[in-house]
């Protein structure tokens, strides 16, 4: 789903009701500081069949209907889920990418072998490093940072190598 009309540089837009519509950056919708509907990430917006959204606490039901209508008009099946950090796809892929970067860093396998093992062993469409690279290392890092800050749990702590790659604008798949 691409937000076009009134889209901000940060991947946000405003619904006709004035509610913020934002792509998931790891923070729950309620943490955005205003009524908001957050849209989960996908592997490929152009081919996705469905997408999850979550509304902030106190968000008007009409805003959820507006967001749902917009996404359905784009051909997506919409699933309304609880407002939680990282939603579903964003949290899962960020954690998989982080684990893969950590395995690469610790010499478990090469980047290519990690992606191949996950594609063939789990039937994922992409390996976790390729998927994380598609979203961008800085995005994966910001999602994990937001989740760790919200939960205070080290399981969301980004790998030191992920931090280094994101800071350098590098590629998760390069050894």
Residue ranges and their predicted role:
Residues 1-85, 91-175:
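NAD(P)-dependent Rossmann-like dehydrogenase/reductase catalytic/cofactor-binding core
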């Amino acid at each position: 789903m691409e937000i076009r009309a009134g889209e901000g540089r940060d991947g946000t837009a405003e619904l006709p009701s004035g509610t913020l519509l934002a792509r998931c950056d790891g923070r729950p919708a309620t943490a955005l500081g205003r009524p908001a509907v957050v849209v989960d990430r996908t592997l490929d917006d152009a081919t996705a069949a469905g997408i999850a959204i979550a509304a902030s606490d106190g968000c008007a039901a009409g805003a959820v209907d507006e967001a749902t209508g917009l996404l359905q008009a784009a051909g997506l099946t919409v699933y309304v889920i609880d407002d939680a950090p990282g939603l579903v796809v964003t949290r899962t892929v960020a954690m998989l990418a982080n684990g893969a970067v950590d395995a690469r860093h610790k010499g478990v396998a090469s980047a290519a072998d990690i992606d191949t093992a996950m594609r063939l062993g789990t039937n994922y469409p992409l390996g976790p490093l390729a998927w994380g690279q598609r979203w961008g290392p800085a995005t994966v890092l910001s999602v994990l940072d937001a989740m760790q800050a919200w939960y205070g749990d080290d399981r969301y702590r980004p790998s030191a190598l992920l931090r280094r790659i994101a800071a350098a604008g590098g590629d998760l798949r390069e050894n």
